[in-house]
Amino acid sequence: MAVPKKRTPKSKTRSRKSQWMRKALKQLQKARTLAGRLAARQDQMQPTQMQPTQMQPN
């Protein structure tokens, strides 16, 4: 005879969800930091690089 399974308590469900959200937020912060670093790096590199059309002929 089939027996229904017990329900997971709400506190356990919420605890797992909050843990998952914490991990997701941490990954989001890491990604944003990395994107900011790369953007800043691109900003620093652009003025120093000369385009072929900007070079002065000798």
Swiss-Prot record:
> Where does the UniProt annotation locate this protein?
Plastid, Chloroplast
InterPro entries for this protein: Ribosomal_bL32 (IPR002677)
Q: Care to name a GO molecular-function term for this sequence?
A: structural constituent of ribosome
Q: Taxonomically, which superkingdom?
A: Eukaryota
Q: Which GO terms describe its biological process?
A: translation
Coiled-coil stretches are none
Query: What coarse category fits the chief subcellular location reported for this protein?
Result: plastid
Which key words tag this protein in UniProt? Chloroplast, Plastid, Ribonucleoprotein, Ribosomal protein
Q: Where is the composition biased (Low complexity)?
A: 44-58
Family classification: Belongs to the bacterial ribosomal protein bL32 family.
Protein name in UniProt: Large ribosomal subunit protein bL32c
Q: Which species?
A: Cyanidioschyzon merolae (strain NIES-3377 / 10D) (Unicellular red alga)
